[in-house]
């Protein structure tokens, strides 16, 4: 019943209020505002992994991976389901894992108040924000969800003049989109959800077939060659992007961020090992991936060895771009801060510098024999991860940000909302959440 669901929303909000009042926020740090005023291009790359990158075959990806801020211990949280990985990258929250693809967290968030998504956050700072996807806009309802994140959104059948294929061309998407934001005097943020890397990995894949010649002499099996070939379309898109940024005179002030939506599940384990050139441990290392954060013009690279994963990208970027946000309201952690650094996988397994925890078998694997992990330590981390998932579900299912910031909400009623008088702007880092207890 409607009354029941309103009660449920109220309970969720109350529990979340109480939980957040106990959480220690991360502080501003030396990297706060480092990229203020830079343009930002973020890319959620379909089935991406770093193992095919080389200076010879993919010079642009190689350059992007080795220039700027280098995250040495980054793990993509998800095994499969694009919408979950994309959601986590965009929201800094975990999806409600009890939801299905068709009833995803993204769908629910399509009507929620989302102040921390990069599109909305950077628009507040005077940026224009564009979003693109090279498949149809109705797929996963991106035309609704991405507009709600602050993007002027275009997809292959809605505003983006490209051929729809299986998969479509990331290069064509790039060619059809860059003029939107390069023609403006304002700083810009553009977000891309790519498609060319989508399985199946054989020569019926339109992008694998297109780039087949470039991989024909590589020493791999056909599926691995086909995987690399379709990902060369992403490389070509990025090469084109870099050229256009240079021509427009904005290359030296544009940060480019790229990560995967999920592990390339279209490859068998043997094929993935073949591509990686090593036997990957299936619990943890197969999720090792890239959080490319290309920043031109630093005097030297910033190398970060903290363990981190998909949800950490948003808070890290908000901090770098000088957006004030209350760090307690996101599940991820700014990787450059002094917070708790942990790489989290979708089954709640996790990795830290000291140990790894396999949730499936409830096994602890210390980083080396000299380290003893106490039950209390393990329990503290397990609880930390559980809480982040629970908090994330509560936030999406109760339109929690609308409640905190006193906004009208489709998820509850205004009577449910507490208006905080000490908030001057939506990003005020006042301790807004030491809140009412009822």
Language-model segments: which ranges?
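Fold-level signal for large, globular catalytic cores of enzyme and receptor domains
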Residues: 13-17
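Short, small-residue-biased leader/transition segments that mark boundaries at the very start
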Residues: 2-9
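Solvent-exposed soluble domains appended to multi-pass membrane proteins
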Residues: 18-438
